[in-house]
Structure formats: C-alpha cells, structure tokens
C-alpha cells in the first residue's frame, strides 16, 4: 500500500511540476519567442528564465532555495557549470544559481516535448548521445558559445 501511495504522490508531483513549467512558458511566450529568434539575444532569454520562470516553478513547487557560493560569479565571465541531474528541479536550480547566462547542453530527445521542445531546440546545444559525431560537435558549439561570453551548463550524468 505504501508503494502505491508513493507512486501516486510522485505522479502528482510530476504533473504539478510540468503544469507550472508550461504555465510559466505560456505566460512568457511572446518574450521567449522574441528572444529565442536570434542567437545574440540569448542573454535576454536566459534573464527571463532566471528572473521569472525558475522562481515561478520553484516557489510553486514549495521550494525556497538558499544559494551559498564559495566564491561569487564574476559578472561578464564565462563559466562551465557541471552538476548531477536527478530531478527536473535541477534545471531550475541551475537557472537560479547564476545571473551569468549559460547555454544548456542536453539530449536531443527533449525536442519532442510540446511547447518546451520548441524553445529547447532554439536555445540549447543538443546532443544525440548515440551518435559520436554529434557528441564531438558539442565541443565546437560549446566553444563558440564560450567565445561569445556565455557559460555552459551541463548534466553529464543525467538520469532524468
């Protein structure tokens, strides 16, 4: 009985997370559409996600994170942020942690998600984990984005 209850709560938690994520995207839709139109406008896209989307989802889920950095991020510097990925909340936390725009590296399968996939395809560095050429191309695209002054956010052990 406990296992059934756990599955029910987990399922409801996921539904609520995706509901909040989609509502946030729909609310910001015109701005996200505009700022995802050109690569050079990505910092504004990131700012929207950092300032509105991530806090909306985090607070809506009942999370009130406190971030303590051993050293603050220097404004205008590029960083490569690497973390384990065990929950969809990890993405929101990555947006939350830094004000410096970072481009996410992620699996190409997420392009298929309704609404989210449209923006994901336009602003992220996608990788086909089964294709060695795709995995190598990620380095070139990441290097280009770093040269543009953007950071890179990656979850190399993603299990979500």
Task: Please place each PLM-identified region on the residue numbering.
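A transmembrane-helix-recognition feature enriched in membrane-embedded lipid enzymes
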Residues: 3-66, 118-122
